[in-house]
Every structure is written in C-alpha cells, then in structure tokens.
Amino acid sequence: MAENGVWKEKGHCRQEHLTGQKKIANLYPRSFVRRGKSMEMRFLVESSLSDLAALQSLVVSTLPEVEIFMPHDEEYLSRIFQTEHSVLGVLAGEKLVAYSIIRYPGTGKDNLGQDLNLAEEDLKNLAHLQAIAVHPHFRGYGLQRELAAAHLQVLESSGYEHICCTVSPKNPVSLNNLLSCGFRVRALIPKFAGWWRYILYKGVSRSSDRPKKAESEDEIGIACSNIDGQRELIRKGYEGYSVGKTGENFDLFYRKME
C-alpha cells in the first residue's frame, strides 16, 4: 500500500493533461488471469465509491500496525472521483479486490515535491500516486505493481514529468513493489500524524531512474527500522533503490547519485 497527502481543491491537472489521459482510455477495461483467477482492470467512477471505501476499511482492519496506511474518508474519495481516470480498480468477477488512486496537488503545501525542494515549475508537472490497496486474500498476485505501472502509464501519457508517493518504513513489501517500478527513496520524514514516511520519486520522462554508482562509494544496506541512519545517508546524497531481507529484518539499499 502507498498513501499520501491532504486534498487540495486547487491544482487539478491542466486541460492538456486531461486530453492526454483520454488517449489511454481505450486500453481499459483489460482482462487478465492470475493464479487461475480471471480479473479485469478498469477505471472506476463514483458509483464504485462504496465498494472502494469498504475495501479500504477491510485493508486497514488487517494491518499489523495502524500507522502503515492512512485511510481517506468518503468525502475525500468522492472529490478524487471528479478527476477523470484518477481511480483504477481490479475486479475478480464483480468483486473489487484492489485499487489505485492518483492525484494532482498543484503547487500547494501538500505537494510532496515541496519535501524534495523541487522548483515551482516542476511542482506544476508533478502528480501523486496517492494510494494503492489490495484485498488481503489477493496479496501476492502482483496487483500492486500492476496498478502502479498502469497508472504511471496514464501519467506519462498525460504529460506529467514527476511522480511522488509515500510509504511507511514498516511496509517493506509495498516499498519493494514501488522501487521495482522505478521509484527511488529521496527523503524520510514524519508526515501524517507524525508517522514516518519515505518520500519516493520517479521521473516519468527519464529512460532510467536507476542510481548510478559513484566510483568512490559502495552500496550501503541499512535496516528499514534505522530511521536516523537512513536520514543521514539521504542527507549525504544517497537514494534508496532496493529492498533486501536479512533474517527477519528488511534492509533498504542505498547508492549515491553521481
């Protein structure tokens, strides 16, 4: 799961971005099979609000720790639906089993690019991968990666150049899924209710977002639970790019960008 942000009325995507999104609409609905189960990915509209809210509640109720995922109320979700192609869902039969939300924060204070000190012009071309959630019975099907990749394609088609999202350090599985989609950890700061969050960034228009290893620096692995150590690495110009497991502990591997 990934989540971030507080709703802002201003900063909806520009008309040319909406025009770009329409180019991808004919790709959905899209049918596929996972582990012998037939599924369909499609854009959701506001009539799916109650199903989405119910799935969100179920997901939150099964979390080992409440701070892993910040849920959104129905008023917030209703406003999200007002922007076309902002919500993708995966259905198994008629049952919603996963969803992804994107949002366009404009240059407001809740734009995650502010946490990365991006220029104002870049903030205007930045979108949030706001949230991804998967039904507990459908975890391990690769749906989080599938949804992230699909919504990234929507944003690329719409002309957005910068994408950000947040992930809890206590959620290494979601972190690994997003890193595999080209995101990189650029910050680690307290966000909602003081909960620690990685700020992940991806440049959509780049051919590759993989950090290049500087000749004088080696890869450094550090426990996801080591907040201070990771913040110090980030301060020194390192980016997190890969998750590994040592025994029962998850490590995030950092490399310094050239």
What are these regions (language model features)?
Residues 165-175, 222-225:
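Conserved beta-strand-loop-alpha-helix junction that forms the acyl-donor binding cleft
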Residues 95-131:
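Conserved acyl-donor/pantetheine-binding loop and adjacent beta-alpha core of acyl/acetyltransferases
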